Amino acid sequence: MTQYTFKPKDFKAFEVEGLDARMEALNEYVRPQLNQLGDYFSEYFTSQTGETFYAHVAKHARRSVNPPVDTWVAFAPNKRGYKMLPHFQIGLFKDHLFLMFGVMHEGKDKAERVKVFDKHFDVLKQLPEDYQVSLDHMKPEKSYIKDLSDDELHKAIDRVKNVKKGEFFVARSLSPKDAELKSDKAFLSFVKETFDEFLKFYE
């Protein structure tokens, strides 16, 4: 019995039609692991940073018609919310699991906060080749850093400073059948390895 990881059938919760039915499926197949991961990694980030981190599992409470196409747990050193701060995420779309760290468009002082990626641009470029960037957390599409030129990366970072909807996240993904999801041990190891890379950008 696994506690933290996700099986291929768990991703199928996003194929369930209708808001209520999909929420029921997410609550049964996905949220238990998000809650466990929330407990585990809020402690992990607290120990790694010396700040008290809190987990925020998506509730999708504002939805009244359209079922969610993704769900997540986010981590930030604020009990009341995470969107205003640079934050970490573990989440799922129907075809992949994602890990992310960065600045959301709702972020407070986001033009300043995103400069950490300018400051550590060489570190960003040297991340392993399966690392990605997401420029819109609401869309599943992500680009591999290795496929982007320095100019494209700089423009993506600058967009956060100049465009209201601008966002920048460094990311890493798994497909539902990847070996890293086969056991809790393998999955937790993958997540820690990834977050340790992301922590290089946390200040």
UniProtKB/Swiss-Prot annotation:
User: Where is the signal peptide, in residue numbers?
Assistant: none
A Pfam family hit: DUF1054
Q: What family is this protein classified in?
A: Belongs to the UPF0637 family.
Full protein name: UPF0637 protein SH1846
Q: Which organism is it from?
A: Staphylococcus haemolyticus (strain JCSC1435)
